[in-house]
Regions:
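Bacterial N-terminal signal peptides
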Residues: 20-29
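Bacterial Sec signal peptide processing site at the extreme N-terminus
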Residues: 32-48
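Alpha-helical segment of the N-proximal tetratricopeptide repeat
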Residues: 43-67, 71
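"A position-specific structural signal for the A-helix of alpha-solenoid helical repeats
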Residues: 47, 84, 91, 98, ...
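N-terminal secretory signal peptides that target proteins for export/translocation
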Residues: 1-15
Length: 299
């Protein structure tokens, strides 16, 4: 038995002696492998923006994309940054408009003077912030459709947000009825509304639902049809313009300017559809164009 043990021991020792030089020879290879460098400049800023987008920190994503989107001359990341900004801003404009309108209804419905005053303040604050976002959306839409043209294909290169938005902001149901919600619920509504709206925007961009958007974005960079995206931009800017109508902030000048930019997006879509006709897109484009005309008549 002792001889058997010795033979086994010596065999293991020989294997260790053989393996040791091999393992040691690999160490320089591992040690000398260059670290993966993080992109700098516009590439680094865009990477930071997509990271923030994936974490549902949309305001930070807007901060990181601002200089890239406004670069002159444009760089390799400029159009990508503009697409990402358009999606975030479109969702946030819708969210803050929804918040403002809910507090407006709450102020009208409540019988409590204190609630009324608080809800009127929240109405004003949300409409004011939403209007700034609407102007930002109009700016990026103008950049993407300059001269009534848009790229035939655009790219959304970002992860799907890891924090999923709700299907509805339940806190606002009580608000609309004139009931009171505490500051914690107000803050949660202010978080949930943009998350919900941006998830809905992503579904709209892929012409499907949230699950389709999530699956397509997980598969890699999402290619977007130019005509489709121009129609999306036009509808988004027109929605932002409504914050300046008589029912909201009543600023006819800004309302007309945004309607003009929505019309520019519509013309960009029309130019592409002239080259490649598509009945479904043409139908949606006509609906957008008719809505722009109708809204301008009501200024």
């Amino acid at each position: 038995m002792k001889d058997s043990f010795r033979r086994s021991y010596h065999a293991r020792s020989r294997r260790r002696r053989v393996l040791a030089p091999i393992l040691l020879s690999l160490l320089p290879v591992v040690a000398c492998s260059p670290p993966v460098e993080r992109p700098k400049g516009a590439g680094g800023a865009y990477l930071d923006a997509t990271d923030m987008f994936g974490r549902a920190r949309y305001d930070r994503a807007l901060e990181f994309t601002e200089s890239v989107a406004n670069a002159s001359p444009p760089n390799a990341y400029t159009e990508h940054a503009r697409v990402l900004r358009a999606i975030i801003l479109s969702g946030e404009v819708s969210a803050y408009k929804q918040l403002g309108e809910a507090y407006s209804k709450g102020a009208e419905a409540t019988k409590n003077p204190s609630y009324k005053a608080q809800y009127e303040r929240l109405r004003h604050d949300n409409f004011q912030y939403g209007s700034k976002l609407a102007l930002g959306l109009a700016e990026v839409a103008q950049q993407l459709t300059q001269g009534g043209t848009i790229s035939k294909e655009l790219t959304l290169e970002a992860p799907y947000p890891s924090i999923e938005g709700p299907m509805t902001v339940t806190q606002l149901n009580r608000v609309r009825e004139g009931g009171w919600i505490e500051s914690g619920d107000q803050e949660q509504a202010a978080l949930d509304a943009p998350r919900m709206s941006i998830d809905d925007v992503l579904a709209d961009v892929v012409r499907g639902d949230r699950f389709k958007a999530q699956a397509r974005m997980k598969a890699g960079p999402l290619k977007l049809d130019g005509a489709d995206f121009a129609i999306f931009l036009g509808n988004g800017v027109l929605g932002g313009a409504s914050l300046f109508d008589q029912k909201h902030l009543h600023d006819p000048q800004k309302f007309r300017i945004l309607c003009g930019i929505a019309d520019q997006a519509a013309k960009a879509a029309a130019a592409l559809l002239k080259e490649n006709p598509d009945p479904d897109k043409e139908k949606r484009l006509k609906k957008l164009a008719d809505q722009i005309k109708a809204d301008l008549k009501n200024v």
